[in-house]
Amino acid sequence: MSIVIDDKKITNINILNKNVQKIVDELTGKIIFEKTKPVSNEYFYIENTYNGSNTISLKTTIGSENITGSHATQLQYSKDKETWTTITLSGTNKIPMNSGERVYFRNDSGSFNWYNSSNQEDSFYTQINCSNNHKVGGNINSLLDYNNHNVAITPYCFYQLFYNNKYLTDANELIFSKTSLADYCYESMFNGCIKLTTAPALPATTLAPYCYQYMFNGCTALTSAPELPATTLSSSCYSGMFGGCTSLTTAPELPATNLELYCYYGMFGGCTSLTSAPELPATTLAPNCYRLMFRNCTSLTTAPSLPATTIAENCYGEMFWNCSKLTVVPTLPATTLERYCYHRMFRECTSLTTAPSLPATTLAEYCYGEMFYGCTSLTTSPVLPATILVQECYQNMFNGCTSLNNVTSYANDISSGKEYTFMWLNNVAATGTFHNLGSATYPINASGIPSGWTEVKN
């Protein structure tokens, strides 16, 4: 074999490797040409696991007829990795599959989806569905550039890719980027995939805003979550990620020690089979970081430790709301609070019999608002050592705690009209003891000391 390069005829050419093409002069050992091809099993593929025919549907939403260039994506597909057919993603493209057949996909434009949440006319994104059961695998980045699987991830590039795909059962062999991600890149990717039982590995250690937001939301057959090794988080990176995964029994480790805005917001909300929570070692918090994280996790019995001593606005807000089997709660060591920091934290935890100590003496607006609302098994309040109250700091704090019969407070004044204790002891036990260890004067009602209770002064 011989070729001509730069007017020079070179003989004795040898192709060294089927995956890495090298043209080598065997006499000099000089590499004349080299091109890395993707390993064959790393093309993104869809495999028909149904015992019969199946049809792939690629539904593309184009916000405006004027979207062109890198957003007007063409894609190639093949059933043998030799013969490739080019399709333009517009409307719905359909590809038939026989039983057991795989269809491979590739692209070399470096761009796939684009979605503009503030102007949907400037949007272009494709959703993949099939008419029967199937699995997906290979390197997802071959949908961006099959010649370079380390291609830079672009914002929204795989947004809603399998959204509401009712027949996707397995994504375990799907390969994701190990490098840094981009804003919204995997948002809602598997959202609503009700048959999905296995998820792909997510090896990235540095995240981007909203990158995994709602990624597996509503995957009701998913029993285990992928490992999440990231230590550098970003705002809303895991927000709603496993929300409504009602078969999920265990959660992945979350090793990050520095949190970001909304990073774990609603992450496991509605995971009704989750029996244990991951350790939460973070000591640097951010506003809303844990908000709604385990809401409606009705099988959760023990809360993780929360070691942070410096907290942030709404950081624990609604964190365990309606965890109806929760009996063990964490120590809350912070002594200086922020607005809404514990707002509704244990609301409707109906099995909770013992509340955590609340050592804080410097309060903030709404800090304990509705914290134990509806905790019907709670009999004794934690000691409330703060002498100076702030706006609605205790509002509805114990409302609906029908077994509560013992409260201790050091407050010195509740008369400023800022509703410090608004309805805080509404619908509690008919009789009880109120330990007034401060100098405050309380009215006899649900916003003070309940009628039928005994006040014991210091």
Task: Tell what function each PLM region has.
Residues 33-458:
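Solvent-exposed loop and capping/linker segments of extracellular ligand-binding repeat ectodomains
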Residues 1-37:
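Viral virion structural and adsorption modules
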